[in-house]
Amino acid sequence: MKIKVIHTSDLHGYFFPTDYLDRERKATGYLSLLNNIKKDDFTILTDGGDTLQGSSFAYYVKEFLGSDIIADLMQNVDYYTLGNHDFNYGYNYLKSYVENMKGKLLCANVTDKTSGIEISPYAVKEM
């Protein structure tokens, strides 16, 4: 059995294959990567955080749409953690993102005693 672990990190809101300046399509962005991944039962997709802030798209989503849009874009992630920039837009925005994520949140150095959101320090996956 071969297991594939695909890890992303520091997306900083760059989901679409563009730099948002010249509007030309580029071989970048999270969605461009997903188009090239063949995910199966032996593929684990993880993300290391710093997802919510950093691009003009991320700022637009924060101002006008809400973090559930970004959670929808990240729906294929099995396990994720939070980076320091994920806290930039405040507790309620981050909480909404976490509540809408399908993957499991892993953080050994974060607790939330008010919301009841499950935050695990690690995970064991049996295959």
Task: Label the model's feature ranges.
Residues 1-127:
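Acidic, metal/ion-coordinating pockets
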